[in-house]
Amino acid sequence: MVLKASGLTKRFHEGPIDLTVLHGVDLQVHAGETLAIVGASGSGKSTLLHLMGGLDAPTSGQVELMGQTLSALSAAEQGNLRNLHLGFVYQFHHLLPEFSALDNVAMPLWIRRQTPAQSAQTATNMLAIVGLKDRIHHRPSELSGGERQRVAIARALVTQPACVLADEPTGNLDRSTADGVFELMLQLARDFGTAFVLVTHDETLATRCGRRFGLVSGRLSEWG
């Protein structure tokens, strides 16, 4: 098992307001599977993804990544584990505008202290896999929306993580481009054996994943 959430509850306190966003969520993610979490805006989808990625701490419950309980680790240990085993894709690509596609994809490898030559070769190969071999020296402003998301996917996969967490990865794309980007993620999951957890409000796209869950008022249930 790659990722496991047990009894995740998240509450926010703002003055007199006590808001429970997630109620005792349980979820298991296995190697190589594609899993969609569908819900309306404000249902807690992004909060759940942040908790599972170790980007925030639950009020109660726990998350296990590759068999290790995140709450039992120091912040530095959590960061190292996350960098080794997780990739992230967001609705907004978060590419650095002053860097080329190649440099954006290579950056996680630089953080791992790979040599510039090794990083460039690995990033070039990954960009070719996502269909951008002729665009590696273009900056984000010189790429289309779909191309920018492909760069973001390449960046998430370049370290060969066990799981990619994707938060509305096609939310800013038109239907045709969204279909292409979504199919690319499914194909890469098959090719690399990487698990993908995709948060989306789009039920049509979600039906193409191996497992589907609905999140309503902070409660998660699996669809048949």
Curated annotation (Swiss-Prot):
SMART domains listed in its UniProt record: AAA
Name the Gene Ontology molecular function terms of this record.
ATP binding; ATP hydrolysis activity; transmembrane transporter activity
Gene3D superfamilies from the entry? P-loop containing nucleotide triphosphate hydrolases
Q: Which PROSITE patterns match?
A: ABC_TRANSPORTER_1, ABC_TRANSPORTER_2, LOLD
Which spans of this chain does the record mark as coiled coil?
Answer: none
What EC identifiers does the entry list? 7.6.2.-
Q: Which UniProt keywords apply?
A: ATP-binding, Cell inner membrane, Cell membrane, Membrane, Nucleotide-binding, Translocase, Transport
Where's the ABC transporter domain?
3-224
In terms of SUPFAM superfamilies, this protein maps to: P-loop containing nucleoside triphosphate hydrolases
Sites where the protein binds ATP: G39, A40, S41, G42, S43, G44, K45, S46
Chief subcellular site?
membrane
* Family named by the database record: Belongs to the ABC transporter superfamily. Lipoprotein translocase (TC 3.A.1.125) family.
Quaternary structure and interacting proteins, as annotated: The complex is composed of two ATP-binding proteins (LolD) and two transmembrane proteins (LolC and LolE).
Q: What does this protein do?
A: Part of the ABC transporter complex LolCDE involved in the translocation of mature outer membrane-directed lipoproteins, from the inner membrane to the periplasmic chaperone, LolA. Responsible for the formation of the LolA-lipoprotein complex in an ATP-dependent manner.
Q: What is this protein called?
A: Lipoprotein-releasing system ATP-binding protein LolD
Its organism's taxonomic lineage begins at: Bacteria, Pseudomonadati, Pseudomonadota, Betaproteobacteria, Burkholderiales
- Whichever gene encodes this chain, its name is lolD
